[in-house]
Amino acid sequence: MKLLLAFRLVIPALVLAAPLHVAAAAAAATPEQKLTALGLTLPTVPNPVANYVPAVRSGNLIFLAGHIPRDAAGKVITGKAGRDATEKESNAAARQATLAVLATLKREIGDLGKVKRIVRVGGFVNATEDFQAQSQVVNGSSDLLVELFGDRGRHARAAIGVGSLPLGALVEIEMIVEVE
């Protein structure tokens, strides 16, 4: 009975706190301020592991190579959705990979406020044959982009299940972004 009472007290507090956190992020003026309000930081941009560059600018478009998720220690988040990771864990990995893409973008343009539009996101999910929630996993990326950029963050998208990814990564996110 005491446990049930504790849940009745804690759950409403969590529900009330969540909108305040989201509201603070929405009120922030720049994408960088929104990251801070959400308690997020951009990771260090890693060096490419093969013969490619992480970003190519052509006119006002920046094509960002696929980025994989890493934990706070810089270790690649690995596994297969549907076997080693749940949909929720895979969604969080997509969010982490998106932060890595944004770190590369910021290094390329200097200020995320210069983003005019997230044009396209490609999401690749390392998954078992029977895993069918690729779209829900890649929502980890899409939702973050809308949180940070508002309507400028709404984009075309592909969410694709694959048999493996570089370094055994759980997900990989690539982007095309229009900038000033």
Walk through the language-model features, giving the residues of each.
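Short, polar/acidic, helix-capping and beta-turn segments at strand->helix junctions
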Residues: A24-E180
